[in-house]
C-alpha cells in the first residue's frame, strides 16, 4: 500500500513535469538514437572472424559490472560532479517508486523511469575509448562490435527497467529474465537494503559476483530466479519505522 508520503511526492513530481512532455516521444528518441547507432556501427563491420566476435561476451560482462558499479557508487552516492545523477535517482526515483508501490500510472511517468535521451549519447561517446583500445589490440571489427554491444545493452537496460515498473501482467510475471530482474529491482527499492543490495538492472551477474544480491544461490539460479523468494537471505536489514508525513517528501523533492 502506498504511503501518504509517497503519494505526496508523486503528486508534487507530476506537477513539475512540463505540460508538453511526451512519454512515448521520450522513449522513441532513446531507441531512435540507439538503433541508429547500432545500424551505423554494424555497417562498419566487414569479414569479422570468430575471434572478433569474442569481444561481445567480454563487453557484455564488462558492461554488467559497470552497470553495477555506477548504480552503487554514483547513483546512490553524493559524488562531487555527479550530484545531478544522485538527486535524480536516490532522492527522486526512489521516492516515486518504493517496494510498496513500484508501478507507473501513465506514460507521463516515463519521465522518472527512463534516463534522458542525451544520456545514451554520453554512454556511446564513453564507449569510444574502449573501442579505440580494442582497435589497437584486437581489430577494427572488434571495435565496432564493442560499440554495437554497448548500445544494445543500454537499450536492454531501459527496456528491462521499464518492465520493472509496469503494472503486473502475465508477460512480466512469466517472461524469463524479465521476471527475475523485476523481483530483483523491486527488492532494491526497499529502503532498508537499497544502498547495499541488488544493483544490477539487466542480469544480476555482478550482484552475484560481488555478493551484493539479496539471494543465496548460484549465478544460473540468480539469472533465472523469476519471482521465487525461497532463496532470499534471512539476515537482510529490516525497514525502520519512518514518518509518513507528506510534507517530509515535499521538502526533499
Q: Positions of the model-derived regions?
A:
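Short, flexible segments with low predicted structural confidence
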Residues: 33, 40-41, 45-47, 61, ...
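Cytosolic-side membrane-entry/anchor segment at the start of a transmembrane helix
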Residues: 1-37
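Helix-coil boundary and interhelical linker segments in multi-pass alpha-helical membrane proteins
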Residues: 39-54, 132-145
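N-terminal signal-anchor transmembrane alpha helix
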Residues: 54-70
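A membrane-cytosol interface segment of integral membrane proteins
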Residues: 228-253
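Alpha-helical transmembrane segments of integral membrane proteins
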Residues: 22, 26-30, 50-58, 144-148
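Hydrophobic core of alpha-helical transmembrane segments in multi-pass integral membrane proteins
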Residues: 24-42, 118-134
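Membrane-embedded catalytic scaffold of the fatty acid hydroxylase/desaturase
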Residues: 65-227
Amino acid at each position: 500500500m502506498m504511503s501518504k508520503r509517497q503519494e505526496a511526492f508523486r503528486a508534487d513530481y507530476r506537477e513539475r513535469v512540463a505540460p508538453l512532455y511526451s512519454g512515448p516521444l521520450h522513449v522513441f528518441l532513446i531507441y531512435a538514437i540507439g538503433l541508429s547507432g547500432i545500424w551505423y556501427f554494424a555497417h562498419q563491420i566487414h569479414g569479422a572472424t570468430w575471434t572478433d566476435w569474442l569481444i561481445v561476451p567480454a563487453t557484455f560482462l564488462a558492461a554488467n559490472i559497470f552497470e553495477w558499479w555506477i548504480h552503487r557508487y554514483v547513483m546512490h552516492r553524493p559524488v562531487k560532479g555527479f550530484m545531478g545523477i544522485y538527486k535524480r535517482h536516490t532522492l527522486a526515483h526512489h521516492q516515486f517508486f518504493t517496494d510498496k508501490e513500484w508501478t507507473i500510472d501513465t506514460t507521463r511517468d516515463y519521465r522518472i523511469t527512463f534516463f534522458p535521451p542525451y544520456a545514451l549519447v554520453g554512454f556511446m561517446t564513453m564507449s569510444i575509448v574502449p573501442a579505440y583500445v580494442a582497435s589497437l589490440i584486437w581489430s577494427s571489427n572488434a571495435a565496432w562490435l564493442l560499440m554495437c554491444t554497448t548500445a544494445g545493452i543500454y537499450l536492454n537496460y531501459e527496456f528491462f527497467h521499464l518492465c520493472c515498473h509496469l503494472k503486473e501482467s502475465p508477460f512480466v510475471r512469466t517472461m524469463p529474465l524479465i521476471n527475475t530482474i523485476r523481483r530483483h529491482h523491486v527488492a532494491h527499492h526497499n529502503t532498508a537494503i537499497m544502498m547495499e543490495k541488488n544493483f544490477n538492472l539487466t542480469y544480476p551477474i555482478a550482484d552475484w559476483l560481488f555478493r551484493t544480491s539479496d539471494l543465496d544461490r548460484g549465478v544460473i539460479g540468480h539469472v533465472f530466479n523469476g519471482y521465487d523468494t525461497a532463496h532470499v537471505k534471512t539476515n537482510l536489514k529490516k525497514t525502520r519505522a519512518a514518518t509518513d508525513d507528506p510534507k517530509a517528501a515535499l521538502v526533499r523533492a
